[in-house]
Amino acid sequence: TRKLELLPAMISPANRADALEQTGAAVYNRIREAQLEGGSRVRYSDDLIEYQKGLAELSGAGLYQISVEGETGCAAVEYVDRDSVLCKELLISPAHMERAVALIAVRHPARRYHVRTPACWEGLPGGYLQPFGMVKWYNRDKEALWAACTHSYMGLGFD
C-alpha cells in the first residue's frame, strides 16, 4: 500500500466540475474492480463492501463515487477521530488523485488526512510504501504462481 499524510494547507482547492457522491456497496465494488482491473488484488464480495460501508458511516463518513474529467473512481473514507480522516482506499488514476483528495477534504473537514492507494500506482508526491497484510499459502501450486507477481493490492482493512 502507498500511504500519504496531508494537512489541509497541502490540499488544492476543489474543482467545481468534479463530483463526490455517496454510493452503495455494489456500485462501489463495481468501480473498484474496474479501477483495479488487470492487477493482482484481493477481490471483496458486495457483502464485505457493505460491511466497510457500515464502518465508514459509523465514523461519520462513507463510500464515495468520484468523478474527475470523465473518469469515475471511488474512495472509502472514515473519521479516525474528529480531527483526522482516513481514506482507506482511493482508487482513481494518479493524474486525478489530487483533485479527488480535494473533494474529500471539502466533504470531510479535518486537521489531518491519511490516504492509501495501491503500491504500484505512483500517486501523490510525498507518498511512501508500507507493506499491508500478509499471505500464507497452504497450496504449493498457488504459492508458485504468487512468486511471479509479489506486488498485490489488498486495499480495505476492516479495522
Model-derived features: positions:
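Active-site/acyl-donor-binding loops of N-acyltransferases
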Residues: 1-13, 89-98, 102-159
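Amide-forming acyltransferase catalytic core, primarily the GNAT-like/NAT-type
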Residues: 1-89, 94-95
